[in-house]
């Protein structure tokens, strides 16, 4: 689980509720229907049904764990390269590999698949992964664009109701509540939930894409029978300073 996402969301909502004091006046059924119901339906309208039905699972990824650490992947790739160079590709078959993308690449090596086909297959899968993740983040970005607009629509609805009932003082308060609370709900939904979710999905997608690129280059290096130490230096160039230092230290 991504502790930062959970703590950040709960903390933001808790601070907002604390600032409200009594949350009762900030709850309005009409405003909820306009902003939450309206934005969901509008997002469904601009999305495909499979994308819409899968949004809960995609959102869950924002709160799920992070991809493997790239420096750990480099160390594992170097270990696999050492085994392959010493005992041959077939010796890789019994190795425990938790990363599914790496496991696929190693399985293709063990099967004797042509190097060009291995690279093409892995690169295509990486591209498809990035496309899926981009679509998931795009869904929440689209929803984040719509939510404040629905808040503005609710504000206009509330103002029309208020102006149409100026002769009835009792109707002015509820109408004004709709006008103000829809704007609040739209801003909260977009800026506290949806935009951070989209950004977190993009961050994790970039991290996973980097890992996959490391795997592709590492698997191809193993296929070519390269020196594991040289492979560690080469793959380390993909990382930032601290990650590279950790990888080099682990490699010895």
Predicted regions and their residues:
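Helix-termination/interfacial motifs at the ends of transmembrane alpha-helices
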Residues: 7-23, 127-204
